[in-house]
Amino acid sequence: LGDVYKRQAEALADVCYPPEDLAAAISSGSFYTDGMIVAPCSMKTLSAIANGYSDSLLIRAADVCIKECRKVVLMPREMPLSRIHLRNMSLAAEAGCVIIPPMLTFYNDSKSVDDMINHALGKALMQFGIVPPGFQSWRGGRLSKEDK
């Protein structure tokens, strides 16, 4: 399945770089981007981003976004979280990253797993001003007569 998703993602991209290509255009702050979303974000990747250990193009691109004050959204995939994971998330947030764990939300009336995934991705895309078609943002709760 991994190769299928990789090919689908590559088909959507203008340019694809191998992870070892630290000389790629996106490894420089002079190459403008709005930022980046790392989804899913392993704890190894989150740790490297949080601690500035730029040993691959992915981490270097995140490092560049952070130093250039561009948006970096991390969607960590681990569960349960250890103290080390939480410390690294805190370090990343202190560096300016936005942490959006792909958690289940129960307030948006999801009907399927796809709805839940799309909601988490919608939250990440909204960080860049992109509102996906059909995305339902919270519009406030309505109390029933029993709740009043």
What are these regions (language model features)?
Residues K6-R7, M89-A93, I117-H119:
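Short, hinge-like loop/turn segments at secondary-structure boundaries
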Residues V15, L22-R87, A92:
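Helix-loop-strand module that forms the ligand-binding subsite of alpha/beta enzymes
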Residues K6-P19:
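Short, structured active-site "lid" loops
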Residues L1-Y5:
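Short, small-residue-biased leader/transition segments that mark boundaries at the very start
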Residues Y17-P18, L74, I99-P102:
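General beta-strand structural signal in soluble alpha/beta enzymes
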Residues L12, A95-G96:
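Short, structured coil segments at secondary-structure junctions
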Residues V98, M103-K148:
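Glycine-rich phosphate/pyrophosphate-binding loop and the adjoining helix
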